[in-house]
Curated annotation (Swiss-Prot):
<keyword id="KW-0808">Transferase</keyword>
<dbReference type="InterPro" id="IPR037133">
    <property type="entry name" value="THP_succinylTrfase_N_sf"/>
</dbReference>
<dbReference type="GO" id="GO:0008666">
    <property type="term" value="F:2,3,4,5-tetrahydropyridine-2,6-dicarboxylate N-succinyltransferase activity"/>
</dbReference>
<dbReference type="GO" id="GO:0016779">
    <property type="term" value="F:nucleotidyltransferase activity"/>
</dbReference>
<feature type="binding site">
    <location>
        <position position="141"/>
    </location>
    <ligand>
        <name>substrate</name>
    </ligand>
</feature>
<keyword id="KW-0963">Cytoplasm</keyword>
<keyword id="KW-0220">Diaminopimelate biosynthesis</keyword>
<dbReference type="InterPro" id="IPR005664">
    <property type="entry name" value="DapD_Trfase_Hexpep_rpt_fam"/>
</dbReference>
<dbReference type="InterPro" id="IPR011004">
    <property type="entry name" value="Trimer_LpxA-like_sf"/>
</dbReference>
<comment type="similarity">
    <text>Belongs to the transferase hexapeptide repeat family.</text>
</comment>
<keyword id="KW-0457">Lysine biosynthesis</keyword>
<keyword id="KW-0012">Acyltransferase</keyword>
<comment type="pathway">
    <text>Amino-acid biosynthesis; L-lysine biosynthesis via DAP pathway; LL-2,6-diaminopimelate from (S)-tetrahydrodipicolinate (succinylase route): step 1/3.</text>
</comment>
<dbReference type="GO" id="GO:0005737">
    <property type="term" value="C:cytoplasm"/>
</dbReference>
<keyword id="KW-0677">Repeat</keyword>
<dbReference type="InterPro" id="IPR018357">
    <property type="entry name" value="Hexapep_transf_CS"/>
</dbReference>
<feature type="binding site">
    <location>
        <position position="104"/>
    </location>
    <ligand>
        <name>substrate</name>
    </ligand>
</feature>
Length: 273
């Protein structure tokens, strides 16, 4: 049986799986899937085009099963001790492994095993959860969190305190996705499998989930669950039908132009290894 078939079958019986009852074949399939996610060979979601993604549900199921097959244990990062089922990505890394990986991880940066970080990315004191994929040249700034199975594109900037939602709890059907060359402003939250399409700029303090109305003030269109490519988005509100109150929304104020790009450009000086 293929990895996928083993995982799919085991997931149907997940309630009966424990660290002591898991079949050796299932355990190895789960661990191999996590290894492939960790190396970037496998992704929870694969891009087909702008705004178009294929979700590998079985890989997400393997992430969930990994919590069923392992006991908590004491983990040590050299400074602190933890009690968890998932070791950190860098727990056993040598200097050569860091050099070969080609990204920077500053003190305070935490990535869990099963996450992937590509070359020239920068991890400030931040958190990257299991199953996440951080692509080349991305900046994960201070106190930003990349949730389980989230997909972060090339040259994305996640500003300080940004939250990118995961899929494990509450259980989501699709991962949250930030496509290539996007800028997410400080303290913004993108969650519930929402997609920010290529080249978009999200201002600070914008909150987007599946039910958030995203209003294009130029066309009057309302989007939900996705930000169209090249959008500049700020927080706003829309009036109720009777005019008695307003509710939060995100507003597309314009399309990205040269002025916007100049303000949000990637600094290559920070990424050279």
């Amino acid at each position: 049986m293929s990895l996928q078939n083993i995982i799919e079958t085991a997931f149907e019986n997940r309630a009966d799986i424990t660290p002591t009852t898991v079949a050796p074949e299932v355990k190895e399939a789960v661990l191999e899937t996590i290894r492939q996610l960790d190396s970037g060979k496998l992704r929870v979601a694969e891009r087909l085009g702008v705004g178009e993604w294929k979700v590998n549900e079985w890989a997400k199921k393997a992430v969930l099963l990994s919590f069923r097959i392992q006991d908590n244990e004491v983990l040590n990062d050299g400074v602190n001790k933890y009690f968890d089922k998932v070791p950190t990505k860098f727990a056993d890394w040598s200097e050569d492994e860091f050099k070969n990986a080609g990204f920077r991880a500053v003190p305070g940066a935490v990535a869990r095993r099963g996450s992937f970080v590509a070359k020239n990315a920068v991890l400030m004191p931040s958190y990257v959860n299991i199953g996440a994929y951080v692509d080349e040249g991305a900046m994960v700034d201070t106190w930003a969190t990349v949730g389980s199975c989230a997909q972060i594109g090339k040259n994305v900037h996640l500003s300080g305190g940004v939250g990118i939602g995961g899929v494990l709890e509450p259980l989501q059907a699709a991962p949250t996705i930030i496509e290539d060359n996007c800028f997410i402003g400080a303290r913004s939250e993108i969650v519930e499998g929402a997609i920010v399409e290529e080249g978009s700029v999200i201002s600070m303090g914008v909150f987007i989930g599946q039910s958030t109305k995203i209003f294009d003030r130029t066309t009057g269109e309302i989007y939900q669950g996705r930000v169209p490519a090249g959008s500049v988005v700020v927080s706003g509100s829309l009036p109720s039908k009777d005019g008695s109150h307003s509710l939060y929304c995100a507003v597309i104020v314009k399309r990205v132009d040269a002025q916007t790009r100049a303000k949000t450009s990637v600094n290559e000086l920070l990424r050279g290894i």
